[in-house]
Design a protein with these regions (language model features):
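A structural preference for short, pocket-lining loop segments at secondary-structure junctions
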Residues: 1-32, 46, 50-62, 83-86
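Long, low-complexity C-terminal extensions of enzymes
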Residues: 171-177, 186, 191-263
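Positions in alpha-helical segments
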Residues: 105, 180-181, 219
Length: 263
């Protein structure tokens, strides 16, 4: 409502990138200490919705690392410009969480099942694939070619199933080695996170907008952040950095439908 503000320009500080996301180590410690973490998500998701609904121009310059919460504060802008070195990702399944900050709205509406591939694997993509996924409007002309479109044949054939076990089976049995490599990535992620993410992504097309997606994200955050997988995933990736998490389930096939629906 400030008449002195005509528009907003979001820039990252430093050369590494716009934003690598939330301080999940601090969130993990809050859980371990028994402290409330709800206010953090209320503020973060509230900001994401404010950006999406902001009535004035909001331009985000997405350079370098633009992941997790970094996408939350940039992908919802009215103009998103990806630099040649932009690196987009929602890597939450790697740490026992789920893609949030409303970004699954874009991933679920991306061509074919490309968004599902990125959500389940946590894969990093460049500027042109960011445009394909709906995370950016324009890519710098110097940006390298994207890869997702060239992978559409096996992505669309394998990620179309509603059961994560069927997705994995399709990837592992596909003739294309890139499909089998994607299966290996998913096998290394939290099985519970993968199953919950797949279900959440499939619900998005029934929603009316980002506000609905953020409401779903808020419910999932309460369930997932207190789970053993989040505690263990952050430990393995960011605390001890041994990269050998011991998930609550050995395999995706071990996650029950009841466990997914409980989230």
């Amino acid at each position: 409502d400030d008449e002195g503000v005509d528009s907003v320009l979001l820039l990252g500080e430093g050369s590494r990138g716009l934003c690598a996301g939330a301080d999940v180590r601090a969130l993990r410690q809050a859980v371990l200490d028994g402290r409330d973490f709800g206010e953090f998500f209320d503020l973060e998701y509230g900001l994401d919705l404010l950006i999406k609904e902001y009535p004035k121009p909001y331009e985000a310059r997405q350079h370098g690392i633009t992941m997790g919460g970094g996408l939350g504060i940039s992908a919802h802008g009215s103009r998103r410009l990806a630099s040649a070195d932009a690196a987009f990702a929602m890597p939450e399944t790697i740490i026992g969480f789920t893609p949030d900050v409303g970004v699954t709205w874009y991933l679920a509406h991306a061509p074919g099942w490309t968004g599902m591939h990125v959500a389940l694997t946590g894969a990093t993509v460049g500027a042109r694939d960011g445009v394909l996924l709906g995370l950016a409007d324009e890519a710098d002309e110097a940006a390298p070619a994207g890869e997702l479109e060239d992978n559409r044949s096996w992505i669309d054939a394998c990620y179309c199933f509603p059961d994560p076990s069927d997705v994995i089976a399709a990837l592992e049995s596909h003739a294309d080695s890139r499909a089998r490599a994607a299966a290996a990535l998913i096998r290394a992620r939290s099985p519970l996170s993968v199953a919950v993410t797949l279900e959440a992504m499939r619900r998005v097309p029934t929603m009316t907008g980002v506000a609905d997606v953020l409401a779903q994200d808020r419910v999932l955050a309460d369930h997932m952040i207190g789970s053993p997988d989040f505690i263990e995933g952050v430990r393995a990736q960011l605390v001890d950095k041994d990269r050998t998490p011991r998930w609550s389930h050995d395999r995706i096939e071990d996650v029950t439908r009841a466990e997914v629906e409980a989230c």
